[in-house]
Amino acid sequence: MLKSTVSNTRIKCCRIDQRRNYLFTALASSALGSFLWSKNNVLASKMENGELHYHDPNLTFNKKLFNGKPPFERRAPDYPGHVPLYNFEKVLMFLGSSMGAFFHPEENKYIVALGESTAITPILQHLRHKMLSDPVGRTILREKPRMTSDSLNLTYLRSLPDNTIGKNYVNWLDKENVSPDTRVPVRYIDNEELAYIYQRYRECHDFYHAITGLPIIIEGEIAVKVFEFANIGIPMSGLGALFAPLRLKPSQRQRLREIYYPWAIKNGLFSKPLINVYWEKILEKDVNEFRQEMGIQQPPDLRNMRKEYFAKKKLEKQLQGRK
């Protein structure tokens, strides 16, 4: 009887201990869960309120590398229509346009892109210095005139005497079927003033043709480019003189080598800077007087030389056929 009572007492004590252990475990789990949950809530609240800052070890490096800007973000343009390019983009444009200009010289888009990709800043700065050193050049940079059919008033130029610069210019335009309105705006040259200097060079190109009498056929273009390069120093003109003749016939290369290259180099080097000519203000001037003042001699008529050459070849074939 006594043993049975003791045994029952032990069983009850064990059950009480188990209940206590279970209760303590439940309380401990609840307390721990409440602590963790509370901590997570605090972290979540800080994140939501922007109070929690995560330190990114790459952040400092990225800021130094990109100066706080996303990679390859194009900077703001320097003037309306300007497209700023990275150096690698300029290299790619030069490579693509040079290949296009060589195989398709009739495509103006390649010539335009090649010209702007090779018009490097030191060359344009040298031209700016040359213009600033001349009273007329300074006036051009200050007034920044643009050449169009309206600004030049082609109708008025056709009414001028035959010996004037304006009449020679408009006659050349009509003969070659070209227009000053075809000169596209500069887009890829940095700095607004340097871009204008290149735009001025581009728009004056037809005047160089007019005062020399050279046509826009490939030989005439090459001769004018050599003349420009010797006088103004634009790199594309030199590249054209170097590579364009590779696609010509032997007879064409011979004419350039023996007649037009010597003329272009001599007259380009020893004449006054063409970049400082304010063409719009001398349209009524005698063209021969202007050539004399500038130190420019006219080359032989290229179209006549070609006609004489083809007539000679035709005669030779006829004589060979009779034999």
UniProtKB/Swiss-Prot annotation:
Which GO BP terms sit in this record?
ubiquinone biosynthetic process
Any idea which residues the transit peptide spans?
1-29
Cleaved signal peptide residues: none
Which enzyme class, named as a word? lyase
Q: From the UniProt record, give the pathway where this protein acts.
A: Cofactor biosynthesis; ubiquinone biosynthesis
Q: Which GO terms describe its cellular component?
A: extrinsic component of mitochondrial inner membrane
* UniProt EC number: 4.1.1.130
**Its topology with respect to the membrane?**
Peripheral membrane protein
The protein's matches in InterPro entries, at most eight in alphabetical order, are given as: Coq4, Coq4_euk
- Residues where Zn(2+) binds: 205-206, 209, 221
Q: Which UniProt keywords apply?
A: Lyase, Membrane, Metal-binding, Mitochondrion, Mitochondrion inner membrane, Transit peptide, Ubiquinone biosynthesis, Zinc
Where in the cell? Mitochondrion inner membrane
Q: Which cofactor does it need?
A: Zn(2+)
Q: Which Pfam families match?
A: Coq4 (PF05019)
> Taking the first listed entry, what is the main subcellular location of this protein, grouped into a coarse class?
mitochondrion
Q: List the catalytic activities from the record.
A: a 4-hydroxy-3-methoxy-5-(all-trans-polyprenyl)benzoate + H(+) = a 2-methoxy-6-(all-trans-polyprenyl)phenol + CO2
What is the role of the protein in this entry?
Lyase that catalyzes the C1-decarboxylation of 4-hydroxy-3-methoxy-5-(all-trans-polyprenyl)benzoic acid into 2-methoxy-6-(all-trans-polyprenyl)phenol during ubiquinone biosynthesis.
What assembly does the database describe for this protein?
Component of a multi-subunit COQ enzyme complex, composed of at least COQ3, COQ4, COQ5, COQ6, COQ7 and COQ9.
Q: Which family does it belong to?
A: Belongs to the COQ4 family.
What is the protein's name according to its record? Ubiquinone biosynthesis protein COQ4, mitochondrial
